[in-house]
Regions:
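Short, basic, alpha-helical segments at the C-terminal edge of helix-turn-helix-like DNA-binding modules
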Residues: 73-79
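Helix-turn-helix
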Residues: 21-24, 28-70
């Protein structure tokens, strides 16, 4: 129930209820896929978590692969896809550290990414194209940032922008896995900062 301008309670329309249900399904699928992966998690697991039938769930998402892609896009809409900092003038180091710390604060977001990214290399995985395109966007984005630093004379001698970009992404994914296994022993933001300080000259 909601309240209209006259103070009288009014019922929410079907669109609002449908949107709420979709968000509930996405949240449940996020939890299931993060814990069990795409292949290990089932539509019934998601439906049970939401408290609805699998048939009703399929009304919102026609297939399991549709649900997976919706969850991945939902994740990026909540956390950012890493390619467009909110402030284009934000320094690369600051943008990376901010994103890493932000991701740590959202329950399950790193688990979901790590599990599904690893699964996506297998044949026939519906997330393969998503992750392939995502890595291509990330490499292009970070290559542009490192190229800009090189033009400003701030990239250390011998460091190539393309290699620095690919290495940053590889480190980030790898350190996330270590952090998931031992969160109290791994300083994710500190490791990323350390790498960037190795390749970027101070101002």
């Amino acid at each position: 129930m909601t309240t209209n301008e006259a103070g009288r309670p009014s019922r929410r329309g079907p669109y609002a209820k449908s949107t709420e249900r979709r968000h509930a399904i996405l949240g449940a699928a996020h939890a299931v896929f993060a814990a069990r992966g795409y292949r290990g998690g089932s539509l019934q697991d998601v439906a049970d978590l939401v408290g609805m039938s699998q048939t009703s769930l399929l009304h919102y998402f026609p297939s399991k692969s549709d649900l997976l892609l919706a969850v991945l896009n939902w994740r990026d809409s909540n956390t950012g896809d890493g390619t467009t900092p909110p402030d284009p003038e934000e320094a690369l180091v600051d943008a990376v550290i901010r994103q890493a710390r932000f991701n740590e604060e959202i329950p399950g977001v790193i688990e979901l990414y790590t599990v599904l990214c690893a699964e996506s290399v297998t044949d026939g995985h519906p997330g393969r194209e998503f992750f392939t395109e995502r890595f291509e966007r990330l490499r292009r984005s970070y290559t542009r940032r490192f190229t800009q630093l090189a033009e400003e004379g701030r990239l250390r001698p011998g460091v190539q922008p393309e290699a620095a970009a690919a290495s940053l992404i590889a480190l980030w994914d790898g350190i996330q896995t270590q952090w998931l296994l031992s969160p109290d022993s791994v300083d994710m933001a500190g490791c990323l900062r350390g790498y960037l300080e190795l390749v970027i000259l101070p101002e």
